[in-house]
């Protein structure tokens, strides 16, 4: 080890094991310096004794600070678990009523002697205790400027130098960071550190008691990308807020308390506290009367425009559908005439009739076909005017039955009017006071329901063969409803009419109620619009939907028409098309025309 110490350079700073703070300037100034130390050495018999140096960190096991000198120029020691009072902070005074004030200094470091007059009730007041407070402000400023001019200028220069140095440092760092070619120079001198390892046995560190390490700074690559992301530092707080000058406090009166009282919220849905709120307060809180409701005229214009547009669209759709139907009818007539002309031509060729004139084109021409159609139309009324004896007798019988039924209906209306005037229930009006459910159960709401005479009780309400107990319907009936609902027009007129004798004194007569309801235009605009009229009439019964029935699904009407016309085999010529060369093996031999399996052949007029 001796040879190694000789080789190593002399250390710059030797680390001491303890620090003696008694020779510091602050200790001499605070506790009297050398004279205080000599007095303390002379009075060694006193319990306080001289100031002891503070042991270094890690070796303060038996050190217990009791006096202010033991703390040095710092605070308490956290590793020593005893009650510590550095500079007397936190220590309770022995005398509770002590009037000794703590020594305070001002911003310049001078002792503030006016603290004596600024205690107690004067603590919150402004006390003028200086001579400068009595001198006018202008004279004070002039005297202070002349007296402190040199000192103030010196402070300005020092502050300027420090600010300049700080700004140059920041600017140089920014410039060096922006210019990577300027590699910052580092102190390449190595440092030697001697220390004692914690493990002092011969098995570790080759039995050495001390170790010396060499510490040097690691070289940095100037082209290496940055390892850390720069984050924005939040801006520091500026000047303190401006003090707000308040008026002197005053006691709160009862009126102020009432003015500050906020009433509870009035809700139309919730009332958790169970308050009883009058209706006038509730309406006032609603705010309905605060503003006047004004309806914009554009709403009426918009509804009128929509109504007119809808009517025009409906008219356009109807016109288009009408034109389309006319075009389809014309096209159908044209094709029928062409087929009829072709059939006539084929029939002429088959029978050997003379051919058509050369001036007429193939197919007979449109003019010839029209002439023949007119002749056939003229012959049909002549045949219809011929009436046989049996037909004439049947017609006379039908007229007689129709006249008898008309007289019977007039008689029933006269009887019903007479019974209504006498207050007697007629056959048609005796069931009007029944409930709707009873009418439905009795089958009175349908046209096919049986209607018997008036009895004490109606047997149709009991022992019905249709219901949930009897399977709800017959076995061969697939519909869940056995009969139509609301299909009788007389019954519908009574279902929607109020009862005759019910509450007539309160609501008026039934006819008056019905008339009032019928005249009520609830869903119509208040103002009429020009060019827009109600196309549909008033509805006096519910909406009914009829099942769409196919027209002649089995072709019976067409079959009967062909039988009545009495077609012959010769008339089939030309109806099967121009190509009929099958030898009986076609699948459509049973149909009219036979021949090819094609469903239709479109013929075009020759050009």
From Swiss-Prot:
Residues 313-349, 391-418 form a coiled coil. Pfam families: SKIP_SNW. Residues 327-339, 379-434, 516-527, 535-550, 562-571 have a biased composition (Basic and acidic residues). Widely expressed. One of its GO terms (biological process) is mRNA splicing, via spliceosome. Keywords: Coiled coil, Nucleus, Stress response. Residues 190-353 are annotated as: SNW. It is found in: Nucleus. Residues 240-251 have a biased composition (Pro residues). Residues 29-77, 178-205, 217-265, 327-434, 516-607 are annotated as: Disordered. Its main location: nucleus. Residues 35-49 have a biased composition (Low complexity). Plants silencing SKIPA exhibit growth arrest and reduced cell viability. Plants overexpressing SKIPA exhibit drought resistance and significantly improved growth performance in medium containing stress agents (abscisic acid, salt, or mannitol). Belongs to the SNW family. Acts as a positive regulator of drought and salt tolerance. Acts as a positive regulator of cell viability. This is SNW/SKI-interacting protein A. The gene is SKIPA.
């Amino acid at each position: 080890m001796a040879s190694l110490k000789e080789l190593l350079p002399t250390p710059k700073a030797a680390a001491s094991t303890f620090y003696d703070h008694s020779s510091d300037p602050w200790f001499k100034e605070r506790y009297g310096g050398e004279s205080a130390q000599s007095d303390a050495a002379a009075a060694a018999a006193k319990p306080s004794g001289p100031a002891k140096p503070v042991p270094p960190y890690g070796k303060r096991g038996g050190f217990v600070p009791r006096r202010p000198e033991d703390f040095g120029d710092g605070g308490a020691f956290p590793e020593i678990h005893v009650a510590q009072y550095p500079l007397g902070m936190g220590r309770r005074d022995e005398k509770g009523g002590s009037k000794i004030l703590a020594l305070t200094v001002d911003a310049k470091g001078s002792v503030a002697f006016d603290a004596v007059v600024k205690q107690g009730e004067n603590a919150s007041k402004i006390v003028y205790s200086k001579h400068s407070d009595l001198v006018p402000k202008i004279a004070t400023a002039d005297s202070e400027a002349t007296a402190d001019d040199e000192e103030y200028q010196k402070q300005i220069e020092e502050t300027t130098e420090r600010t300049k140095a700080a700004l140059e440092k920041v600017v140089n760092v920014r410039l060096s960071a922006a210019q990577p070619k300027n590699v910052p120079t580092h102190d390449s001198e190595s440092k030697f550190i001697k220390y004692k390892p914690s493990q002092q046995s011969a098995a570790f560190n080759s039995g050495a008691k001390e170790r010396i390490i060499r510490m040097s700074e690691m070289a940095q690559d100037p082209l290496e990308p940055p390892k850390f992301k720069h984050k924005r530092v939040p801006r520091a707080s500026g000047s303190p807020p401006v003090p707000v000058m308040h008026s002197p406090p005053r006691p709160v009166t009862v009126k102020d308390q009432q003015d500050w009282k906020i009433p509870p919220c009035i809700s139309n849905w919730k009332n958790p506290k169970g308050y009883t709120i009058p209706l006038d307060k509730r309406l006032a809180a609603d705010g309905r009367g605060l503003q006047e409701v004004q309806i914009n005229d554009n709403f009426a214009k918009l509804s009128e425009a929509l109504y007119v547009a809808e009517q025009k669209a409906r008219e356009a759709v109807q016109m288009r559908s009408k034109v389309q139907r006319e075009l389809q009818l014309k096209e159908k007539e044209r094709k029928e005439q062409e087929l009829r002309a072709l059939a006539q031509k084929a029939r002429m060729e088959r029978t050997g009739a003379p051919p058509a004139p050369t001036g007429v084109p193939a197919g007979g021409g449109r003019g010839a076909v029209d002439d023949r159609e007119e002749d056939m139309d003229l012959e049909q009324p002549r045949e219809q005017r011929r009436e046989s004896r049996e037909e004439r007798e049947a017609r006379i019988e039908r007229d007689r039955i129709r006249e008898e039924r008309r007289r019977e209906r007039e008689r029933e209306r006269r009887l019903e009017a007479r019974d209504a005037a006498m207050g007697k229930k007629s056959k048609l009006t005796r069931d009007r006071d029944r409930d709707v459910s009873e009418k439905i159960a009795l089958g009175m709401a349908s046209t096919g329901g049986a209607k018997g005479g008036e009895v004490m009780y109606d047997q149709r309400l009991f022992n019905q063969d249709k219901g949930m107990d009897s399977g709800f319907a017959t076995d061969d009936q697939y519909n869940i409803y056995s009969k139509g609902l609301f299909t009788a027009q007389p019954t519908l007129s009574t279902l929607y009419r109020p009862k005759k004798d019910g509450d007539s004194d309160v609501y008026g007569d039934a006819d008056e109620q019905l008339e009032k309801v019928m005249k009520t235009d609830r869903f119509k605009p208040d103002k009429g619009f020009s060019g827009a009229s109600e196309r549909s009439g008033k509805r006096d019964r519910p909406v009914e939907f009829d099942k769409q029935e196919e027209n002649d699904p089995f072709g019976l009407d067409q079959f009967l028409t062909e039988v009545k016309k009495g077609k012959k085999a010769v008339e089939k010529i030309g109806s099967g098309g121009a190509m009929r060369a099958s030898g009986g093996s076609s699948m459509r031999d049973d149909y009219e025309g036979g021949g090819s399996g094609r469903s239709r052949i479109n013929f075009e007029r020759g050009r």
